[in-house]
Amino acid sequence: MGARASVLTGGKLDQWEAIYLRPGGKKKYRLKHLVWASRELERFACNPGLMDTANGCAQLINQLEPALKTGSEGLRSLXNTLAVLYCVHSNIPVHNTQEALDKIKEKQEQHKSEPKKPEAGTAAAADSSISRNYPLVQNAQGQMVHQPLTPRTLNAWVKVIEEKAFNPEIIPMFMALSEGATPSDLNSMLNTVGGHQAAMQMLKEVINEEAAEWDRTHPAPVGPLPPGQMRDPRGSDIAGTTSTLAEQVAWMTSNPPIPVGDIYRRWIVLGLNRIVRMYSPVSILEIKQGPKEPFRDYVDRFYKTLRAEQATQDVKNWMTETLLVQNANPDCKQILKALGPGATLEEMMTACQGVGGPAHKARVLAEAMAQAQTATSVFVQRGNFKGIRKTIKCFNCGKEGHLARNCKAPRRRGCWKCGQEGHQMKDCKNEGXQANFLGKGWSPFKGRPGNFPQTTTRREPTAPPLESYGSQEEKSTQGKEMQENQEKTETSLYPPLTSLRSLFGNDLSSQ
Protein backbone atom coordinates (compact mmCIF):
# COMPACT_ATOMS: atom_id res chain seq x y z
CA MET A 1 0.00 0.00 0.00
CA GLY A 2 2.70 2.44 1.04
CA ALA A 3 2.63 6.18 1.25
CA ARG A 4 0.46 7.62 -1.50
CA ALA A 5 2.11 10.74 -2.86
CA SER A 6 0.03 10.79 -6.07
CA VAL A 7 -3.38 11.49 -4.50
CA LEU A 8 -3.53 14.92 -6.17
CA THR A 9 -2.12 15.97 -9.51
CA GLY A 10 -2.30 18.98 -11.78
CA GLY A 11 -4.63 21.78 -10.82
CA LYS A 12 -5.88 20.03 -7.67
CA LEU A 13 -2.32 19.81 -6.39
CA ASP A 14 -1.88 23.55 -6.99
CA GLN A 15 -5.13 24.20 -5.15
CA TRP A 16 -3.90 21.98 -2.28
CA GLU A 17 -0.60 23.85 -1.96
CA ALA A 18 -2.40 27.22 -1.86
CA ILE A 19 -4.33 26.41 1.36
CA TYR A 20 -2.88 27.67 4.66
CA LEU A 21 -2.54 25.41 7.69
CA ARG A 22 -3.88 28.04 10.10
CA PRO A 23 -5.90 31.25 9.69
CA GLY A 24 -3.44 34.10 9.37
CA GLY A 25 -0.46 31.74 9.26
CA LYS A 26 2.37 31.51 6.75
CA LYS A 27 2.73 27.74 6.31
CA LYS A 28 0.79 25.98 3.56
CA TYR A 29 -0.07 22.38 2.79
CA ARG A 30 2.55 20.41 0.90
CA LEU A 31 2.88 16.98 -0.63
CA LYS A 32 4.52 15.67 2.55
CA HIS A 33 1.24 16.14 4.42
CA LEU A 34 -0.47 13.66 2.08
CA VAL A 35 2.32 11.15 2.62
CA TRP A 36 2.03 11.55 6.38
CA ALA A 37 -1.77 11.17 6.30
CA SER A 38 -1.56 7.93 4.30
CA ARG A 39 0.92 6.46 6.77
CA GLU A 40 -1.26 7.43 9.71
CA LEU A 41 -4.27 5.76 8.07
CA GLU A 42 -2.25 2.57 7.65
CA ARG A 43 -1.30 2.73 11.31
CA PHE A 44 -4.98 2.96 12.25
CA ALA A 45 -5.80 0.00 9.96
CA CYS A 46 -7.68 2.20 7.48
CA ASN A 47 -7.48 2.09 3.69
CA PRO A 48 -5.35 4.98 2.33
CA GLY A 49 -6.88 4.37 -1.10
CA LEU A 50 -10.02 6.16 0.07
CA MET A 51 -8.07 9.42 -0.07
CA ASP A 52 -8.32 9.41 -3.88
CA THR A 53 -12.01 10.43 -3.92
CA ALA A 54 -14.26 12.83 -2.06
CA ASN A 55 -16.59 9.99 -1.01
CA GLY A 56 -13.66 8.07 0.44
CA CYS A 57 -12.50 11.12 2.42
CA ALA A 58 -16.05 11.52 3.77
CA GLN A 59 -16.05 7.90 4.94
CA LEU A 60 -12.72 8.35 6.69
CA ILE A 61 -13.92 11.56 8.37
CA ASN A 62 -17.09 9.83 9.61
CA GLN A 63 -15.00 7.00 11.03
CA LEU A 64 -12.53 9.26 12.85
CA GLU A 65 -15.04 11.86 14.06
CA PRO A 66 -16.24 10.00 17.23
CA ALA A 67 -12.64 9.62 18.47
CA LEU A 68 -11.63 13.26 17.95
CA LYS A 69 -12.89 14.40 21.36
CA THR A 70 -10.61 12.03 23.28
CA GLY A 71 -7.95 11.62 20.60
CA SER A 72 -4.44 12.98 20.47
CA GLU A 73 -3.13 15.95 18.52
CA GLY A 74 -1.97 13.63 15.76
CA LEU A 75 -5.48 12.22 15.31
CA ARG A 76 -6.94 15.72 15.10
CA SER A 77 -4.34 16.75 12.55
CA LEU A 78 -5.23 13.69 10.47
CA UNK A 79 -8.92 14.65 10.49
CA ASN A 80 -8.09 18.23 9.53
CA THR A 81 -5.95 17.02 6.62
CA LEU A 82 -8.76 14.77 5.39
CA ALA A 83 -11.24 17.66 5.67
CA VAL A 84 -9.07 19.89 3.47
CA LEU A 85 -8.53 17.04 1.02
CA TYR A 86 -12.30 16.50 0.81
CA CYS A 87 -12.81 20.17 -0.09
CA VAL A 88 -10.14 19.94 -2.79
CA HIS A 89 -11.77 16.85 -4.32
CA SER A 90 -15.21 18.50 -4.16
CA ASN A 91 -13.90 21.77 -5.69
CA ILE A 92 -14.97 23.75 -2.61
CA PRO A 93 -12.84 26.92 -2.41
CA VAL A 94 -11.20 27.30 1.01
CA HIS A 95 -8.23 29.34 2.20
CA ASN A 96 -7.28 27.53 5.41
CA THR A 97 -8.08 24.48 7.52
CA GLN A 98 -10.71 26.21 9.65
CA GLU A 99 -12.74 27.16 6.58
CA ALA A 100 -12.65 23.55 5.39
CA LEU A 101 -13.99 22.33 8.75
CA ASP A 102 -16.75 24.94 8.66
CA LYS A 103 -17.76 23.92 5.12
CA ILE A 104 -18.00 20.25 6.10
CA LYS A 105 -20.02 21.12 9.20
CA GLU A 106 -22.47 23.18 7.14
CA LYS A 107 -22.85 20.35 4.65
CA GLN A 108 -23.56 17.83 7.41
CA GLU A 109 -26.23 20.10 8.91
CA GLN A 110 -27.87 20.58 5.52
CA HIS A 111 -27.91 16.84 4.94
CA LYS A 112 -29.55 16.21 8.32
CA SER A 113 -32.27 18.76 7.58
CA GLU A 114 -33.13 17.17 4.20
CA PRO A 115 -36.07 14.66 4.23
CA LYS A 116 -35.26 11.03 3.53
CA LYS A 117 -36.16 9.71 0.08
CA PRO A 118 -38.77 6.93 0.09
CA GLU A 119 -37.17 4.97 -2.76
CA ALA A 120 -34.28 3.50 -0.88
CA GLY A 121 -33.90 0.50 -3.16
CA THR A 122 -32.76 2.36 -6.23
CA ALA A 123 -29.10 2.94 -6.96
CA ALA A 124 -29.57 6.70 -7.15
CA ALA A 125 -31.11 6.79 -3.70
CA ALA A 126 -28.33 4.61 -2.35
CA ASP A 127 -25.69 6.93 -3.75
CA SER A 128 -27.37 10.12 -2.51
CA SER A 129 -27.88 8.90 1.06
CA ILE A 130 -25.07 8.53 3.57
CA SER A 131 -24.09 4.90 3.91
CA ARG A 132 -24.30 3.26 7.29
CA ASN A 133 -21.16 2.86 9.35
CA TYR A 134 -19.06 -0.21 8.85
CA PRO A 135 -19.64 -3.16 9.56
CA LEU A 136 -23.34 -2.61 8.82
CA VAL A 137 -23.46 -2.03 5.06
CA GLN A 138 -26.26 -1.66 2.56
CA ASN A 139 -26.57 -4.28 -0.16
CA ALA A 140 -27.93 -3.84 -3.69
CA GLN A 141 -31.51 -4.45 -2.52
CA GLY A 142 -31.28 -1.65 0.04
CA GLN A 143 -31.17 -3.99 3.01
CA MET A 144 -28.77 -3.52 5.92
CA VAL A 145 -26.53 -6.54 6.29
CA HIS A 146 -23.68 -7.26 8.68
CA GLN A 147 -20.13 -7.57 7.45
CA PRO A 148 -17.84 -9.05 10.12
CA LEU A 149 -14.54 -7.56 11.12
CA THR A 150 -11.66 -8.48 8.85
CA PRO A 151 -8.67 -10.44 10.19
CA ARG A 152 -6.55 -7.43 9.37
CA THR A 153 -8.49 -5.26 11.82
CA LEU A 154 -8.23 -7.88 14.55
CA ASN A 155 -4.51 -8.27 13.86
CA ALA A 156 -3.99 -4.51 14.21
CA TRP A 157 -5.80 -4.56 17.56
CA VAL A 158 -3.70 -7.48 18.84
CA LYS A 159 -0.47 -5.74 17.81
CA VAL A 160 -1.47 -2.59 19.66
CA ILE A 161 -2.11 -4.58 22.85
CA GLU A 162 1.20 -6.44 22.51
CA GLU A 163 3.28 -3.33 21.82
CA LYS A 164 1.56 -0.72 23.97
CA ALA A 165 0.09 -3.00 26.67
CA PHE A 166 -2.49 -0.72 28.29
CA ASN A 167 -0.99 2.69 27.67
CA PRO A 168 -3.42 5.60 27.20
CA GLU A 169 -3.12 5.50 23.39
CA ILE A 170 -4.97 2.17 23.10
CA ILE A 171 -8.32 3.89 23.84
CA PRO A 172 -8.46 6.05 20.68
CA MET A 173 -7.11 3.07 18.74
CA PHE A 174 -9.97 0.92 20.03
CA MET A 175 -12.46 3.67 19.20
CA ALA A 176 -11.18 3.88 15.63
CA LEU A 177 -11.19 0.11 15.03
CA SER A 178 -14.60 -0.52 16.62
CA GLU A 179 -16.58 2.27 14.96
CA GLY A 180 -20.08 0.98 14.13
CA ALA A 181 -19.32 -2.54 15.38
CA THR A 182 -21.95 -4.83 16.89
CA PRO A 183 -21.62 -6.37 20.36
CA SER A 184 -20.54 -9.64 18.71
CA ASP A 185 -17.73 -7.83 16.87
CA LEU A 186 -16.61 -6.15 20.09
CA ASN A 187 -16.53 -9.51 21.88
CA SER A 188 -14.40 -10.86 19.03
CA MET A 189 -11.90 -8.05 19.59
CA LEU A 190 -11.77 -8.76 23.33
CA ASN A 191 -11.41 -12.51 22.82
CA THR A 192 -8.35 -12.04 20.59
CA VAL A 193 -6.38 -10.64 23.53
CA GLY A 194 -4.34 -13.60 24.76
CA GLY A 195 -2.36 -12.12 27.62
CA HIS A 196 -3.24 -9.61 30.33
CA GLN A 197 -5.99 -11.82 31.75
CA ALA A 198 -6.05 -9.82 34.98
CA ALA A 199 -6.92 -6.71 32.98
CA MET A 200 -9.54 -8.65 31.03
CA GLN A 201 -11.13 -9.81 34.28
CA MET A 202 -11.31 -6.18 35.47
CA LEU A 203 -12.95 -5.27 32.18
CA LYS A 204 -15.58 -8.01 32.65
CA GLU A 205 -16.39 -6.71 36.12
CA VAL A 206 -16.94 -3.20 34.77
CA ILE A 207 -19.19 -4.55 32.01
CA ASN A 208 -21.25 -6.52 34.55
CA GLU A 209 -21.64 -3.40 36.72
CA GLU A 210 -22.82 -1.31 33.78
CA ALA A 211 -25.21 -4.07 32.64
CA ALA A 212 -26.75 -4.23 36.12
CA GLU A 213 -27.13 -0.45 36.12
CA TRP A 214 -28.84 -0.66 32.70
CA ASP A 215 -31.32 -3.24 33.98
CA ARG A 216 -32.08 -1.05 36.99
CA THR A 217 -32.74 2.07 34.94
CA HIS A 218 -34.55 0.22 32.12
CA PRO A 219 -36.92 -2.30 33.75
CA ALA A 220 -38.55 -4.94 31.57
CA PRO A 221 -42.22 -4.35 30.62
CA VAL A 222 -44.82 -6.40 32.47
CA GLY A 223 -46.89 -8.84 30.41
CA PRO A 224 -46.46 -10.37 26.99
CA LEU A 225 -45.34 -8.32 24.01
CA PRO A 226 -47.71 -7.58 21.12
CA PRO A 227 -47.21 -9.71 18.00
CA GLY A 228 -44.47 -8.38 15.70
CA GLN A 229 -42.91 -6.07 18.29
CA MET A 230 -39.27 -6.51 19.25
CA ARG A 231 -38.34 -6.85 22.88
CA ASP A 232 -36.21 -4.22 24.55
CA PRO A 233 -32.57 -5.25 25.06
CA ARG A 234 -31.42 -6.16 28.55
CA GLY A 235 -27.94 -5.57 29.91
CA SER A 236 -26.81 -9.06 28.95
CA ASP A 237 -28.25 -8.53 25.44
CA ILE A 238 -26.17 -5.39 25.01
CA ALA A 239 -23.08 -7.30 26.17
CA GLY A 240 -23.79 -9.90 23.48
CA THR A 241 -24.16 -12.89 25.82
CA THR A 242 -27.94 -13.49 25.52
CA SER A 243 -28.62 -11.95 22.09
CA THR A 244 -27.99 -13.18 18.58
CA LEU A 245 -26.31 -11.28 15.77
CA ALA A 246 -29.66 -10.88 13.96
CA GLU A 247 -31.25 -9.30 17.03
CA GLN A 248 -28.33 -6.93 17.42
CA VAL A 249 -28.58 -5.83 13.77
CA ALA A 250 -32.35 -5.41 14.13
CA TRP A 251 -31.98 -3.22 17.20
CA MET A 252 -29.35 -1.08 15.49
CA THR A 253 -31.43 -0.63 12.29
CA SER A 254 -34.91 -0.28 13.81
CA ASN A 255 -36.92 2.93 13.85
CA PRO A 256 -36.09 4.44 16.27
CA PRO A 257 -32.76 2.61 16.47
CA ILE A 258 -31.30 1.26 19.71
CA PRO A 259 -27.50 1.60 19.35
CA VAL A 260 -26.54 -1.49 21.35
CA GLY A 261 -23.09 -1.48 19.74
CA ASP A 262 -22.32 2.08 20.82
CA ILE A 263 -23.65 1.42 24.33
CA TYR A 264 -21.50 -1.69 24.71
CA ARG A 265 -18.48 0.13 23.31
CA ARG A 266 -19.00 2.90 25.88
CA TRP A 267 -18.92 0.30 28.66
CA ILE A 268 -15.69 -1.17 27.30
CA VAL A 269 -14.09 2.29 27.17
CA LEU A 270 -14.97 2.83 30.84
CA GLY A 271 -13.26 -0.44 31.71
CA LEU A 272 -10.23 0.42 29.58
CA ASN A 273 -9.93 3.75 31.37
CA ARG A 274 -9.76 1.98 34.72
CA ILE A 275 -7.16 -0.45 33.39
CA VAL A 276 -5.08 2.37 31.93
CA ARG A 277 -5.19 4.20 35.26
CA MET A 278 -4.00 1.04 37.02
CA TYR A 279 -1.19 0.40 34.50
CA SER A 280 -0.18 4.08 34.51
CA PRO A 281 -0.29 5.13 38.19
CA VAL A 282 1.55 8.39 37.53
CA SER A 283 -0.59 11.44 38.19
CA ILE A 284 -0.57 14.47 35.95
CA LEU A 285 0.64 16.51 38.94
CA GLU A 286 3.85 14.44 39.05
CA ILE A 287 4.84 15.15 35.45
CA LYS A 288 7.59 17.76 35.69
CA GLN A 289 10.27 18.76 33.23
CA GLY A 290 13.82 17.84 34.11
CA PRO A 291 16.57 20.47 34.17
CA LYS A 292 18.13 19.12 30.94
CA GLU A 293 15.03 17.54 29.38
CA PRO A 294 13.92 18.97 26.01
CA PHE A 295 10.57 20.70 26.10
CA ARG A 296 9.24 18.44 23.33
CA ASP A 297 9.82 15.27 25.37
CA TYR A 298 8.22 16.90 28.40
CA VAL A 299 5.10 17.79 26.37
CA ASP A 300 4.87 14.21 25.06
CA ARG A 301 4.95 12.79 28.59
CA PHE A 302 2.46 15.40 29.78
CA TYR A 303 -0.17 14.65 27.13
CA LYS A 304 0.37 10.91 27.44
CA THR A 305 -0.46 11.08 31.14
CA LEU A 306 -3.26 13.58 30.54
CA ARG A 307 -4.97 11.11 28.24
CA ALA A 308 -5.23 8.60 31.10
CA GLU A 309 -6.81 11.14 33.47
CA GLN A 310 -10.50 10.57 34.21
CA ALA A 311 -11.78 14.11 33.78
CA THR A 312 -13.95 16.16 31.49
CA GLN A 313 -12.54 18.04 28.54
CA ASP A 314 -12.90 21.37 30.36
CA VAL A 315 -10.83 20.09 33.27
CA LYS A 316 -8.21 18.74 30.87
CA ASN A 317 -8.03 22.10 29.13
CA TRP A 318 -7.48 23.79 32.49
CA MET A 319 -4.73 21.29 33.33
CA THR A 320 -3.07 21.99 30.01
CA GLU A 321 -3.15 25.77 30.45
CA THR A 322 -1.97 25.71 34.08
CA LEU A 323 0.17 22.65 34.78
CA LEU A 324 2.04 22.62 31.47
CA VAL A 325 3.64 25.95 32.34
CA GLN A 326 3.79 25.45 36.10
CA ASN A 327 5.71 22.14 35.94
CA ALA A 328 8.25 23.26 33.34
CA ASN A 329 11.87 23.88 34.35
CA PRO A 330 12.89 27.45 35.28
CA ASP A 331 14.34 28.26 31.85
CA CYS A 332 11.25 27.17 29.90
CA LYS A 333 8.91 28.61 32.53
CA GLN A 334 10.47 32.05 32.09
CA ILE A 335 10.00 31.84 28.32
CA LEU A 336 6.42 30.55 28.57
CA LYS A 337 5.39 33.29 30.99
CA ALA A 338 6.78 35.86 28.59
CA LEU A 339 4.56 34.46 25.80
CA GLY A 340 1.41 35.09 27.83
CA PRO A 341 -1.61 32.93 28.64
CA GLY A 342 -3.00 32.90 25.09
CA ALA A 343 -0.03 31.17 23.46
CA THR A 344 -0.67 28.03 21.43
CA LEU A 345 1.23 24.78 21.84
CA GLU A 346 3.07 25.36 18.58
CA GLU A 347 4.30 28.76 19.77
CA MET A 348 5.41 27.25 23.08
CA MET A 349 7.39 24.46 21.41
CA THR A 350 8.96 26.90 18.95
CA ALA A 351 9.99 29.29 21.74
CA CYS A 352 11.45 26.51 23.92
CA GLN A 353 13.08 24.62 21.08
CA GLY A 354 16.68 25.59 21.87
CA VAL A 355 16.44 25.41 25.67
CA GLY A 356 19.04 23.03 27.09
CA GLY A 357 21.39 23.19 24.10
CA PRO A 358 24.97 24.53 24.02
CA ALA A 359 23.94 27.92 22.65
CA HIS A 360 21.32 28.42 25.36
CA LYS A 361 23.75 27.34 28.09
CA ALA A 362 26.39 29.78 26.83
CA ARG A 363 23.86 32.61 26.73
CA VAL A 364 22.65 31.87 30.26
CA LEU A 365 26.25 31.70 31.53
CA ALA A 366 27.10 35.02 29.89
CA GLU A 367 24.05 36.67 31.44
CA ALA A 368 24.95 35.28 34.86
CA MET A 369 28.53 36.58 34.59
CA ALA A 370 27.29 40.00 33.48
CA GLN A 371 24.92 40.17 36.43
CA ALA A 372 27.71 39.14 38.81
CA GLN A 373 30.02 41.85 37.48
CA THR A 374 27.28 44.43 37.74
CA ALA A 375 26.56 43.44 41.32
CA THR A 376 30.29 43.65 42.19
CA SER A 377 30.64 47.11 40.68
CA VAL A 378 27.57 48.34 42.53
CA PHE A 379 28.96 46.88 45.74
CA VAL A 380 32.25 48.72 45.33
CA GLN A 381 30.60 51.99 44.35
CA ARG A 382 28.29 52.00 47.31
CA GLY A 383 31.18 51.32 49.69
CA ASN A 384 29.55 48.50 51.60
CA PHE A 385 32.81 47.50 53.28
CA LYS A 386 32.28 46.69 56.92
CA GLY A 387 36.00 46.61 57.80
CA ILE A 388 38.68 49.31 57.54
CA ARG A 389 40.10 49.78 54.09
CA LYS A 390 43.79 48.93 53.87
CA THR A 391 45.86 51.66 52.23
CA ILE A 392 48.04 50.48 49.39
CA LYS A 393 51.71 51.39 49.32
CA CYS A 394 54.25 51.37 46.51
CA PHE A 395 57.33 49.20 47.03
CA ASN A 396 59.29 51.24 44.50
CA CYS A 397 59.04 54.79 45.84
CA GLY A 398 57.51 54.12 49.24
CA LYS A 399 54.54 56.44 48.70
CA GLU A 400 50.94 55.54 49.38
CA GLY A 401 48.04 55.59 46.95
CA HIS A 402 49.36 53.42 44.13
CA LEU A 403 51.10 50.13 43.44
CA ALA A 404 54.59 49.51 42.14
CA ARG A 405 53.35 48.45 38.71
CA ASN A 406 51.69 51.85 38.31
CA CYS A 407 54.59 53.86 39.77
CA LYS A 408 55.99 56.65 37.56
CA ALA A 409 59.29 56.95 39.47
CA PRO A 410 62.46 55.27 38.11
CA ARG A 411 62.46 51.59 38.84
CA ARG A 412 64.61 50.73 41.85
CA ARG A 413 67.18 48.01 41.55
CA GLY A 414 67.47 45.11 43.90
CA CYS A 415 65.01 43.19 46.02
CA TRP A 416 62.24 45.23 47.56
CA LYS A 417 62.28 42.99 50.62
CA CYS A 418 65.92 42.65 51.66
CA GLY A 419 67.57 45.36 49.53
CA GLN A 420 70.13 43.06 47.88
CA GLU A 421 70.63 42.95 44.14
CA GLY A 422 70.59 39.87 41.95
CA HIS A 423 67.05 38.70 42.63
CA GLN A 424 63.50 39.99 42.92
CA MET A 425 61.18 40.08 45.88
CA LYS A 426 59.20 37.03 44.66
CA ASP A 427 62.44 35.00 44.61
CA CYS A 428 63.78 36.33 47.92
CA LYS A 429 64.85 33.57 50.33
CA ASN A 430 65.46 35.83 53.33
CA GLU A 431 62.88 35.21 56.01
CA GLY A 432 62.50 38.80 57.09
CA UNK A 433 63.71 42.31 56.36
CA GLN A 434 67.36 43.31 56.66
CA ALA A 435 68.49 43.44 60.32
CA ASN A 436 71.09 45.66 61.97
CA PHE A 437 73.61 44.50 64.58
CA LEU A 438 71.02 44.82 67.33
CA GLY A 439 68.69 42.35 65.54
CA LYS A 440 66.12 44.97 64.75
CA GLY A 441 64.54 45.40 61.36
CA TRP A 442 65.96 48.26 59.37
CA SER A 443 65.05 49.38 55.91
CA PRO A 444 68.21 50.09 53.88
CA PHE A 445 66.52 52.79 51.83
CA LYS A 446 65.18 55.27 54.30
CA GLY A 447 65.17 55.89 57.99
CA ARG A 448 68.04 55.13 60.38
CA PRO A 449 69.13 52.09 62.39
CA GLY A 450 67.42 51.18 65.60
CA ASN A 451 70.57 51.66 67.74
CA PHE A 452 70.42 55.43 67.34
CA PRO A 453 68.89 57.11 70.39
CA GLN A 454 65.36 58.11 69.59
CA THR A 455 64.81 61.49 71.22
CA THR A 456 61.34 62.77 71.47
CA THR A 457 60.38 66.17 72.76
CA ARG A 458 57.89 65.73 75.53
CA ARG A 459 55.99 68.59 77.05
CA GLU A 460 56.27 68.90 80.83
CA PRO A 461 53.23 69.96 82.80
CA THR A 462 53.33 73.64 83.82
CA ALA A 463 50.81 73.42 86.62
CA PRO A 464 51.97 74.48 90.13
CA PRO A 465 52.81 71.77 92.68
CA LEU A 466 50.13 70.50 94.94
CA GLU A 467 49.77 72.26 98.27
CA SER A 468 50.89 70.25 101.29
CA TYR A 469 48.58 69.74 104.20
CA GLY A 470 49.26 68.36 107.64
CA SER A 471 48.19 64.83 106.92
CA GLN A 472 50.37 64.68 103.84
CA GLU A 473 53.42 65.94 105.81
CA GLU A 474 52.88 63.27 108.42
CA LYS A 475 52.72 60.58 105.77
CA SER A 476 55.90 61.84 104.11
CA THR A 477 57.81 61.94 107.44
CA GLN A 478 56.63 58.43 108.28
CA GLY A 479 57.83 57.22 104.89
CA LYS A 480 61.27 58.77 105.40
CA GLU A 481 61.64 57.18 108.84
CA MET A 482 60.75 53.73 107.51
CA GLN A 483 63.29 54.11 104.70
CA GLU A 484 66.06 55.12 107.12
CA ASN A 485 65.33 52.18 109.42
CA GLN A 486 65.52 49.79 106.45
CA GLU A 487 68.90 51.21 105.39
CA LYS A 488 70.30 50.80 108.94
CA THR A 489 69.19 47.19 109.07
CA GLU A 490 70.88 46.40 105.75
CA THR A 491 74.09 48.12 106.93
CA SER A 492 74.17 46.08 110.11
CA LEU A 493 73.64 42.80 108.29
CA TYR A 494 75.94 43.52 105.34
CA PRO A 495 78.78 45.94 106.30
CA PRO A 496 80.31 47.86 103.36
CA LEU A 497 83.46 46.44 101.84
CA THR A 498 86.32 48.96 102.12
CA SER A 499 88.82 46.57 100.53
CA LEU A 500 89.10 43.18 98.85
CA ARG A 501 91.41 41.74 101.54
CA SER A 502 88.60 39.97 103.32
CA LEU A 503 87.75 38.08 100.15
CA PHE A 504 91.10 37.38 98.50
CA GLY A 505 93.54 37.71 101.36
CA ASN A 506 96.16 40.27 100.38
CA ASP A 507 94.85 42.98 98.15
CA LEU A 508 97.07 43.05 95.12
CA SER A 509 95.99 46.53 94.21
CA SER A 510 97.23 47.94 97.54
CA GLN A 511 100.73 46.49 97.19
UniProtKB/Swiss-Prot annotation:
Maturation and modification: Gag-Pol polyprotein: Specific enzymatic cleavages by the viral protease yield mature proteins. Capsid protein p24 is phosphorylated possibly by host MAPK1; this phosphorylation is necessary for Pin1-mediated virion uncoating.
User: What segment(s) does the record annotate as region Interaction with Gp41?
Assistant: 7-31
Region (PPIA/CYPA-binding loop), start-end ranges: 219-227
Segments for region (Interaction with host PPIA/CYPA and NUP153):
191-229
N-myristoyl glycine: lipidated positions: 2
**Where along the chain is composition biased (Basic and acidic residues)?**
105-119, 472-490
Q: Where is this region: Dimerization/Multimerization of capsid protein p24?
A: 279-365
Interaction with membrane phosphatidylinositol 4,5-bisphosphate and RNA: annotated span: 14-33
Any one GO molecular-function label of the UniProt entry: zinc ion binding
Keywords from the named record: AIDS, Capsid protein, Host cell membrane, Host cytoplasm, Host endosome, Host membrane, Host nucleus, Host-virus interaction, Lipoprotein, Membrane, Metal-binding, Methylation, Myristate, Phosphoprotein, Repeat, RNA-binding, Viral budding, Viral budding via the host ESCRT complexes, Viral nucleoprotein, Viral release from host cell, Virion, Zinc, Zinc-finger
Entry note about domains: Late-budding domains (L domains) are short sequence motifs essential for viral particle budding. They recruit proteins of the host ESCRT machinery (Endosomal Sorting Complex Required for Transport) or ESCRT-associated proteins. p6-gag contains two L domains: a PTAP/PSAP motif, which interacts with the UEV domain of TSG101 and a LYPX(n)L motif which interacts with PDCD6IP/AIP1.
Protein name (Swiss-Prot/TrEMBL): Gag polyprotein
Q: What is the lineage of its organism?
A: Viruses, Riboviria, Pararnavirae, Artverviricota, Revtraviricetes
